[in-house]
Amino acid sequence: MSRLNVLYATDTNYAPHMAASIYSLLEHNSSFEKINIYVIDDSISPEVKEKLCTMLSEFNNAEIIFYPFEKLQPKLKIKETWFAMVGYARWMLSEITEEDKILYIDCDTIVNGSLEELWNTDISDCIVAGVQDNPALFALEAVGMNRNDRYINSGVMLINLKTWREQSIEEKIIQMIKEHNGFVMHHDQGIINGVCKNSIKILHPKYNTMSQFFLLKAKQIKSLYDINNYYTQEELDEAVSNPVIVHYINKFYGRPWFDYCSHPMRNLYIEYLKKTPFEVKLKKGKQKTSVRIRKFVFEHSPFFIYALSERILNIRRKVKAKRQ
């Protein structure tokens, strides 16, 4: 029996975005006989849960399982901000399911194709597989990595739960949080990279097509972040032209549920949100001044000027991080 196990985490406010992601996933993956959708439930209202269950009833191969966030808090045994606690709780996976493999997906995504090839990826020789991200060097060093290590974005991850349990990854996560006095650079993403750094598989970028892939060329990303190992331009082109999962990271474009969003695949999100039981109501707002300035520099200056400004910003971020 072909069974797909997927994990999301949300509260009531983010549930409509998760619903759009789930609907797109189910619409493109009818080939699976069973799809288990696990949701870490951070006080989702009964009304919203009912809407989600009603939506899933349209698909005869899907089941949604809510797991209360409150049950995971005691296991963390740390004092932290709400944001970080929810993020870290995602990795208490042995509490949530007894399956041997699970696919974690962020709520701010749309699935645009079959997940069969991704799900069937051989991860027997690693703990986690994901798409490479490009943090600044100080962010890598903050979690015990260096420029030669390949750091992944935690928005889409295929996780080997069998090895996860055998290597006591959850205990290592808690230990790392304690060693960093509750603050780990990039929160849950930094944690997963720091703990699993010697057991990470890199996936094709089409499985987590992030905003920077639409903006920057491969050689620009390598230059900007001083990366030794990265995707080819052909791989990035394929990810942009035929993404399997679109990840609406809040970079230059903004989130697709804001009226100012300029993401080239924003309409795909709107299309799937309309198929859910939730109202399509774009939020009014304005991008942060700092983002607008960076965007202006990127669009109206030679790339080396933009790169210089980003390096200056990274120095400021590094100083700020050391104060925390």
Regions found by a protein language model. Give the residues of each.
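A conserved acidic beta->alpha catalytic loop
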Residues: 43-47
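GT-A fold catalytic core of metal-dependent nucleotide-sugar glycosyltransferases
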Residues: 66-72, 86-136, 151, 156-159
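Short, acidic, metal-binding catalytic loop of nucleotide-sugar glycosyltransferases
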Residues: 24-33
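A glycosyltransferase accessory/donor-loop signature
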Residues: 1-4, 10, 166-324
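Active-site-proximal specificity loops/subdomain of glycosyltransferases
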Residues: 48-49, 55-95
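N-proximal low-complexity "stem/linker" segments adjacent to membrane-targeting elements
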Residues: 1-23
